[in-house]
Amino acid sequence: MIVVFAMMTVMNVKAQDNNVQPYYELDQMPKLIEIMPAPPAFDSPEFANDIVRYGWGKQQREDEERLELAIADAEWDDLTKVFLQWKDAFGLEISEMGTPEIYKLMVTALATTDPMRKETKAYYHRERPFERFNDTMPSHEEDDLRGEGSYPSGHSLRGWGISLLLAQIAPQRASEIFSRGWDYCNSRVIVGAHWQSDVDASRTAASIGFCALQGNEAFITQMKKAQAEYAEKTGTTDVREVRAQARQQSARIFHIDGTPADENSHGVVIENGKKKVQ
């Protein structure tokens, strides 16, 4: 158990550049161990589906392009490379120098949500697919992952979390962003790092962490900066401005005859509590 925690601590430190201060400490975040069910038992229909999906993943490796993508999705340490996997979907490359506000938001948010997996992983210590089948991984992660719990998937929790954050920054590209995030999570099945149920649980876990962030004032402030930076960098209209204009239009005052108060009206209006004909 100590070894497992030590391995996860190393991975967590690598993922958090320069010891980023998270929006919330881990003990302030929802406890997945109290929320998520146990992973499927070996004799359950859910685990039977895991076996089927493991076979599906191995079939996907026959597609060289998909396999190459799955291997690239395995990156963990370099967040700039991780973010690069969403470049086309997001419509913008994320980097510390090129998009400092977006980068700060993403790194700090992940420093907050990534550690959520640790307690549940250690508690269930689920055997990984490549371990159970004594298989090799095309992403060559065996030495790093062997002995570390499979449930939930850290990559999938992070990947779906990234998708949620990017879709909040650029909701007009949500379809592309979530499509990329879905495939990113499934890459963990393809390389044999995780069972499908690990991945599915992690999407839910990421959503839980994402919701928790919405109540943090520092996160809200940084999200607004990230949204403004995205609008500036891409030349797109800030959707918040569009919505504000729509609210302003819907809040206009009208005369009794139905004409806007800021336009000339004709007919009967109410003035000082009395009817008046214009």
Language model region names:
Residues 16-191, 204, 212-222, 228-232:
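Hydrophobic alpha-helical bundle signature of multipass membrane enzymes
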Residues 1-16:
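Bacterial Sec-dependent N-terminal signal peptides
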Residues 255, 264, 270-271:
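Acidic surface patches and DE-rich sequence motifs
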Residues 192-201:
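Short acidic/histidine-rich active-site segments
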Residues 268-278:
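C-terminal tail/sorting-segment detector
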Residues 235-257:
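Residue-level detector of functionally pivotal "anchor" positions at catalytic/ligand-binding pockets or at interdomain
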